[in-house]
Amino acid sequence: SSVVVGVTDTNFDPTHEELQGKYTYMTSGLTNSNIAHGTSVAITIAGGTDNSLGKSSIGYNTQMQLRGMTYNEILAASYAGAKIINASWVSGCSFSQYAQDVITEAYNNGSLIVASAGNGTTCGGASNLAYPAAYDHVLSVTSVGPQDNHERFPGNSLITHQHNTAVDICAPGYD
């Protein structure tokens, strides 16, 4: 495949059946099969789609780099050829010039950084900015429920996603 996606996260299970043959690189020290966040994100992005197992991904015939959850790893993924770099994590609630410079460098190198806008309790509330999603040159993604609800359970603001001025796109979420 000519498409390489950098997945920056933690807790990948490299032995998972949906990841077999799907990644070209994995930063050492990121494995933990008991916690599924990195594995789940990687499978959604580019897990096996034609193996009659589990769930199909959105990135048929796509390869991944499985990398750590840092700005240095975003830059490393970019220079290693990742055209798309996922960051389904929050590093903080305030702007960092260093982090913005890294994002800009990866962007100028031809990489699109896609980041989750954050969970609603992140940074003090759903309307507050969370980073890296709020940086320039990042495609910030949030979700909405089937009744245009921001909360997983309407009326329960403890389980929600960020909906702020940095959000670029809203995808279907929850059930």
Spans of features found by a protein language model:
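Short, solvent-exposed loop/beta-turn-alpha elements that line the ligand-binding surface or hinge
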Residues: K55
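Acidic-leg catalytic submotif of subtilisin-like serine proteases
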Residues: S1-L30, S40
